Amino acid sequence: EPINPEDCIFNPEWFEFYNEAEIDFKNRDFLFFGFVDPSLGKTKHSDFSAIITLAKHKVSGYMYVMDADIERRHPDKIIGDILEKEKMLRRDYGRGYKKFGAETVQFQWFLKEELAKASAKAGLYLPIEEVPQTSDKTMRIQTMQPDVKNHYIKFNKRHKRLLEQMEHFPMGAHDDGVDALEGCRTIAKKMKRFRVLDKGKLGL
């Protein structure tokens, strides 16, 4: 059946897109945050897993969706892909994730433990933050509505699967990308905005 837009939480007209050519993520004012929704044990089919990367600008507070990697894959590949993203960030931007969130509900704690082991073995020491998602998913994702509506979160037109999931939530067949974006946004918002201090006031 066709989805009625009025039943959905996010209006596509709210999506603000950034131009990759105009944003320099190498700038040190950007901090990188990641989140994985592995979808282990959620359904019989273990649908899509989602790895979201946000770049948060320390001064403006805006959050840019750098990467929205949503696909079907086994746990070993999820872990490998996360570590590759960390390596890519270090190689291309000179620094890795400030924080990386992983859901630890049900079977998903297993993936977090294996990710930590693999990360240490690779010498990457990913800064993993456990996120025990216990609240109602739809209500949790609904809290992201003002951030989308006010353009605090900036999207990339390349991320078609994420945008489609956003547009259809909560009526769509898949929501792993939306769930991971909400988790990533929550971790990024916990990191307070950067303030320029007057050294004179500190007696420096």
Label each residue range with its predicted role.
Residues 4, 45, 88-95, 154, ...:
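Intrinsically disordered or highly flexible coil/loop and linker segments, enriched in small
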Residues 1-3, 8-14, 156-160, 177-182, ...:
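Short coil/turn segments at secondary-structure boundaries
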Residues 25-56, 180:
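Gly/Thr-rich phosphate-binding beta-strand-loop-beta motif of the actin/hexokinase/Hsp70
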Residues 21-27, 41-45, 84-93:
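Short, conserved, surface-exposed binding loops centered on an aromatic residue
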Residues 165-188:
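Charged alpha-helix within mobile-element recombinases
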Residues 4-6, 20, 184-204:
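Acidic two-metal-ion nuclease catalytic site recognized across multiple nuclease folds
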Residues 1-39:
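ATPase catalytic-site recognition across NTP-hydrolyzing enzymes
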Residues 50, 57-172:
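Mg2+-dependent endonuclease catalytic cores in nucleic-acid-processing enzymes, primarily RNase H-like
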